[in-house]
Amino acid sequence: MTTVPIDNIRNFSIVAHIDHGKSTLADRLIQITGGMSDREMAGKEQVLDSMDIERERGITIKAQTVRLNYRAKDGKDYIFNLMDTPGHVDFAYEVSRSLAACEGSLLVVDASQGVEAQTLANVYHALDAGHEIVPVLNKVDLPAAEPDKVKQQIEDVIGLDASDAVMISAKTGLGVPDVLEAIVTRLPPPKGDRGATLKALLVDSWYDVYLGVVVLVRVVDGVMKKGQRIRMMGTGAAYDVERVGFFTPKMTAVDELGPGEIGFITAAIKEVADTRVGDTITDDRKPITEMLPGFKPAIPVVFCGLFPVDADDFETLRAAMGKLRLNDASFSFEMETSAALGFGFRCGFLGLLHLEIIQERLSREFDLNLIATAPSVIYKMKLNDGSEIEIHNPVDMPDVVKIAEIEEPWIEATILTPDEYLGSVLKLCQDRRGNQKELTYVGARAMVKYDLPLNEVVFDFYDRLKSVSKGYASFDYHLTDYKPADLVKMQILVNAEPVDALSMLVHRTRAEGRGRAMVEKMKELIPPHMFVIPIQAAIGGKIIARETVRALRKDVTAKCYGGDITRKRKLLEKQKEGKKKMRQFGKVDIPQEAFIAALKVDS
């Protein structure tokens, strides 16, 4: 295979909000450059979204890559490396890795919907990575498309000159050849020194049953060849390279990858944990001293417990999580036991969509039936003895008398909404203890910035936002800092026994409402037993809400015909004693639905 000069390589990513046509544009680029024949493309959409769940939800979760060959109008042959990045806020880490491997971005905006909140976040990521950005307006063939208005919006909101934005319809292929020319003329080539020591960026890694761990790399300097001994600078692990190649989107083997090229390697790596995303790869025999800048390990933001409904599935769940961890560096888990739910795992996620997707993948790919406990965030606690601790599980909270102060994480949220729903959106943010920072208008849409406690967002904020705005509002957030908060630990007691899986940290002002809603829900779903079951919500020793499940009535006097009243009384007293004893020692069966419903309660 002939080596293409570095000036003829273009590494670019496509940045867009969910559902603005990013993966469809990628399909067209692959088709036009001959990456896949029309026959192979037939009946296939979103070629790069390999997971079913990605296609169904219309979202990209893993960053994908493909190499395309293109002969431009100037008669030269070019190599395009396209990185298809996720668009959702939870996967911002995957976006930042992919962007670091590229020099330019195509900003795809739906001409009928305009700029959305996550478009903004991802564009800022691209600008931070020093990218040249080419605006592309998609879906211009729709009757609702307003390209001029959207161009103006790109200039007003993002501050990019959109006068020469490329107009396309990715679905029909209209204007897509112009995108290819714009990539050649408007995006810069990579820089790199072929003669230098190997320096490469680890962009992503996943597990393949036959090949072991497949590592996606972007070579910065030097050459990566078969048989070479490489070292991961972050973990210090060394390996011999077995295969080198790239995706077209099919795996294609080559002898070496030069500077500026993006491809994959395999090296008999058993654990994806050894290949930290964002790590620097170098030659083991003459390593470089400085790592590539700007990468940090992904830090989980939202935590929740996952427990198998059937206790026998515990080992299957452990193996399944291990497999998902292979493909998802940002998912973490540790073992946890719960008196109510048995053995399970405490898992850390990047955000709520990430949590939902992991849950769905566990149930789909591994056929597991799971219960998830209430999501929580990391709280910092200053104790009276001067020490500080961090907890993300309410069960680990120390005694109240030992705590001097609790701090909770806050986020800055950017919400874009049509102005007719602004009132409902502001009320929602206000109810969630938000502080409004700014409000600006972009055409007929309002852009609001709010400071909100993350604790209030992880439950159901996104769903509520979509329902108050009829699905039109878009939302993006980033963590800002920790602030002191008046938080209390609320426990749910069933028959005077605390149910650890339902305990949570809530703000004092919201505790009563949430507690009442949870006990009412539990009352509906716990079946009657032979004895009375009190369901209580408590903060410390104080009960803030109570409901009672009535006992089943068993008529012990049925066998007495007439006769002496003392006989009946004796039987009733005996039953009373038995019920009292049963209440002391009896176990209440809490059905799974009761847990799930209590955790989904909206206060």
Curated annotation (Swiss-Prot):
Xref: NCBIfam families: lepA, small_GTP
Presence of the UniProt keyword Lipid biosynthesis in the record: no
Pfam families with a match to the protein in the record: EFG_C (PF00679), GTP_EFTU (PF00009), GTP_EFTU_D2 (PF03144), LepA_C (PF06421)
Record protein name field: Elongation factor 4
Family: Belongs to the TRAFAC class translation factor GTPase superfamily. Classic translation factor GTPase family. LepA subfamily.
Membrane topology listed for this record: Peripheral membrane protein
Species whose genome carries this gene: Rhodopseudomonas palustris (strain BisB5)
Gene symbol of the encoding locus: lepA
CDD domains in alphabetical order: EF4_III, LepA, lepA_C
Classification via PROSITE patterns: G_TR_1, G_TR_2
Summary of the function given for this chain in its UniProt record: Required for accurate and efficient protein synthesis under certain stress conditions. May act as a fidelity factor of the translation reaction, by catalyzing a one-codon backward translocation of tRNAs on improperly translocated ribosomes. Back-translocation proceeds from a post-translocation (POST) complex to a pre-translocation (PRE) complex, thus giving elongation factor G a second chance to translocate the tRNAs correctly. Binds to ribosomes in a GTP-dependent manner.
